[in-house]
Amino acid sequence: RPGRLDVKIKLDRPDAAAAAEILARYLDGRTPLTTGGVDAAEFRRGLIDAIVERLYARSDANRFIEVTYAGGDREVLHVADFVSGAMLAGIVGRAKKAAIKELIGGGERGLRHDHVLSACAAEIAENEELPNTTNPDDWARISGRKGERIVFLRTLVGSRALNPS
């Protein structure tokens, strides 16, 4: 179409600081909160910190997949290695939807920590299907890893193994 630009721009996955900035755009001053008497700005910052901490912790709970490279080296990738702006938007959207459903059901108005933590868990669970591709080239593209070819994938969520060969 005239005037349309078909330019692809590669963006790296956000680190924890960038994720916090992205989340601040979605959890702005217009988002109703159930603060329990805490300053709204401080509470909002706490929600953002809770999401970032849940996604970026290099803990056993966040181990996502183990890749084996052609040279035999192995690497464990965590949830943080797959975070995207879309995932962050999805978490906030899920949390807001949960808060709205609760309000409609007679609950309190506003977003709470349990809403965002449940939304994180749901978004991570949905993304557990991500490694189901068996093409190593697709996998390298999805994970954003460059360099040596991936020859074997083992999901650490549900202990399934995928062999791309």
Predicted regions and their residues:
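C-terminal engagement/docking regions of AAA+ P-loop ATPases
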Residues: V67-S165
